[in-house]
């Protein structure tokens, strides 16, 4: 590998909207996410609709599924 062309690899704090946070390594010192393994329905086993942009309502309106 060539020297001094790669970005610095530092510890990174990942913060979720649910309040969970963990540390990993990345090029960025801080990352904010909407969904993590603590609140994602696949990992929690709960069935809730994750709809960040109103996609479900838009689909129902488009196909008249009220």
From Swiss-Prot:
Cofactor names: Zn(2+)
Q: Which GO terms describe its cellular component?
A: ribonucleoprotein complex; ribosome
What span is annotated as the signal peptide, if there is one? none
* Keyword terms, alphabetized: Metal-binding, Ribonucleoprotein, Ribosomal protein, RNA-binding, rRNA-binding, Zinc
What processes in GO biological process is this protein linked to? translation
The protein's matches in HAMAP family, at most eight in alphabetical order, are given as: Ribosomal_bL31_1 (MF_00501)
| Alphabetical list of PROSITE patterns matching this protein | RIBOSOMAL_L31 (PS01143)
- State the organism of origin: Campylobacter lari (strain RM2100 / D67 / ATCC BAA-1060)
- Role: Binds the 23S rRNA.
What is the protein's given name? Large ribosomal subunit protein bL31
Give the protein family.
Belongs to the bacterial ribosomal protein bL31 family. Type A subfamily.
Gene name on record?
Answer: rpmE
Q: How is the cofactor bound?
A: Binds 1 zinc ion per subunit.
InterPro entries to which the protein is assigned, alphabetical = Ribosomal_bL28/bL31-like_sf (IPR034704), Ribosomal_bL31 (IPR002150), Ribosomal_bL31_A (IPR027491), Ribosomal_bL31_sf (IPR042105)
Question: Can you tell me which residues bind Zn(2+)?
Answer: 16, 18, 36, 39
Task: Give the top-rank taxon of the lineage listed in the UniProt record for this protein.
Answer: Bacteria
The record describes its quaternary structure and partners as:
Part of the 50S ribosomal subunit.
Q: Name one GO molecular function term.
A: metal ion binding
Concerning NCBIfam families, the annotation shows: L31, PRK00019.1, PRK00528.1
Checking Pfam families in the record gives:
Ribosomal_L31 (PF01197)
């Amino acid at each position: 590998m060539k020297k001094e062309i790669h970005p610095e690899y530092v510890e990174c704090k990942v913060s979720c909207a649910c309040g969970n946070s963990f540390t990993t390594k990345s090029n960025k010192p801080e990352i904010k996410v909407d969904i993590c393994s603590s609140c994602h329905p696949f990992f929690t086993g709960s069935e809730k609709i994750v709809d960040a942009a109103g996609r479900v309502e838009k689909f129902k309106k488009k196909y008249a599924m009220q």
